[in-house]
Amino acid sequence: MGKRISFLLLLFALFHVLILPVMGENSVTHLFPAYRYEGIVTKDSEGVSVGDVVKMIESESGKSHLVMKSNGKRIRLPWDAVTPIQKESPSLPAVTAEDVVAFVYKMGYTSKTDYMLFTDLSRFRTYLLEYGDEGWEMTRSLPCAVGDPYHPTPSGRFEIDYKCSCIGKTDQYLCRHAMCFYGSYMYHSVLLDWKGEAVLDGRLSSAISHGCIRLSPEDSAALYAIIPTGTAVYIR
């Protein structure tokens, strides 16, 4: 009887030491699935055939798409050679600040500064993390708008290269608090009129931009005020 109890206690201990941590890690990873912009090839070109499904990485509006083939090779295709696949927003469970932090540690995310930005394309959320005495802590969860199917928001690891108080198109629109992380891709406010006073398009929590990540005027201002250049950006 004593040996049986000892054996059961050993199994119980092994379950908690070996099995539960793995289950926990997997569940955290599954909470944040990688979003994938995809398109269907409509013209034979550079080793791809009509009907092939490719991953869309970035686009130059009206000119070309940078895509990834099934073998991992990246190629640039003419604008009209790919038709983006329209996707429904995935139904995902709500996540807590603890979930976000656990995922960041699980993935090994790091930053050169005491700040980190993590944008969850599936949930249309941008999380601000700050590093303190106890490690990373999520301090803000912000609704955002991301790239539409024709203009994907690039995924991966980036850094804030530079900041600009405003950008825009003369006499058409203006965006405030721009923070560039990759080429012409940046975080910035929603679209304002040319004077920067009235909101022209304040939509958030949707895929409607040309690849940049839009935030409310208040949230973009808050990030702009504290995020230094060199801060890591993770987009998934």
Question: What is each residue range found by the language model?
Answer:
Residues G2-M23:
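Sec-dependent N-terminal signal peptides of Gram-positive bacterial secreted proteins and lipoproteins
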Residues S45-D80:
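SH3/SH3-like beta-barrel superfamily modules
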Residues M68-T110:
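Boundary regions of SH3-family modules and the immediately adjacent low-complexity/disordered segments
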Residues P152-S155, C164-R236:
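Exported/periplasmic cell-wall-interacting domains
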Residues N26-E58:
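Beta-loop motif signature
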Residues K43-G47, P149, L223-I226:
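Short, surface-exposed secondary-structure edge patches
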Residues R36, G62, K112-D114, L121-F124, ...:
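Extracytoplasmic
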Residues A102-D148:
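A structural motif detector for short, solvent-exposed N-terminal "entry" segments of globular domains
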